[in-house]
Curated annotation (Swiss-Prot):
Pfam families, per database record: H2O2_YaaD
Listed GO CC annotations: cytosol
InterPro entries: YaaA (IPR005583)
Protein's recorded name: UPF0246 protein MGAS2096_Spy1821
Length: 243
């Protein structure tokens, strides 16, 4: 069985379905540290204006006082990649695939199933904060490595900020898809192409119930197709031809 890892997103939209917010134990220390920060501290930590930091401070205070609601993560996050993932009108098989084989890597919650209930928050591995004297990456590394050991065959749709959260020896069987546009024999890639393609790729995997590495090579989605000559055992390259 394939396991997919996807990142979080800054952009969020509130779904209709909500739950009580239950925070995993490792996240408690992060919440305590974030809730204790002033608006000025948060502005520096996030590298945002104080006006925007006030909104984030209120979110942390609400979580600390157990006033926050929680929402299925894959529905709450609404960044470009998420908007290209099929999230509505799923078949029973697609719903099972999304909730059992797709995991979200979070600097606040750890690695969680795609449908895990989470609260509105802003947090990533670039957030300037120490937890128990450690960087966020060092703090989470044991949990992340344990997940990797339990799920050796991972399809990583993660961005570069996660490269050194996992130890290298945990990623020996990982495959990272790469998405490129071809025009007049030249190949290019950028974040917009990649984010849209990640969502379309995951949707194609769900719809085709891909369970083996070889099945990924036959996928065709949003104009992309597998390119064997540019691919390696650990990097599958998908090309889309532009007019």
């Amino acid at each position: 069985m394939l396991t997919f890892l996807i990142p979080t997103a800054k952009e969020m939209v509130i779904p209709k379905e909500s739950y009580p917010h239950l925070l995993p134990q490792p996240s408690q220390a992060i919440l305590k540290a974030m809730a204790a920060m002033t608006t000025e501290d948060l502005a520096k930590s996030y590298r945002i204006k104080e006006e925007a930091a006030k909104k984030e401070q209120q979110r942390w205070q609400d979580m600390a006082s157990q006033q926050s609601l929680a929402y299925p993560a894959y529905q709450l996050f609404n960044g470009l990649m998420y908007r290209h993932i099929k999230r509505d009108k799923l078949t029973t098989q697609e719903q099972a695939y999304l909730t059992q084989q797709v995991y979200i890597t979070s600097s606040f919650y750890g690695i969680i199933p795609a449908n895990h209930p989470i609260a509105e928050h802003r947090h990533d591995f670039h957030t300037r904060i120490k937890i128990e004297g450690q960087s966020l990456k060092s703090y989470w590394r044991p949990c992340y490595n344990q997940f990797a050991k339990e799920h050796p065959q991972v399809i990583s749709l993660l961005s570069s900020e996660f490269d050194d959260v996992f130890s290298k020896d945990c990623k020996q069987l990982w495959i990272s898809p790469k998405f490129m546009a071809e025009k007049e024999g030249r190949f290019k890639t950028h974040s917009t192409i990649s984010k849209k393609a990640r969502g379309a790729f995951l949707t194609a995997c769900m719809e085709n119930n891909c369970q083996t590495v070889d099945s990924l090579k036959s996928l065709v989605f949003a104009g992309f197709y597998y390119h064997p000559d540019l691919s390696t055992d650990h990097e599958f390259v998908y090309i889309k031809k532009e007019a």
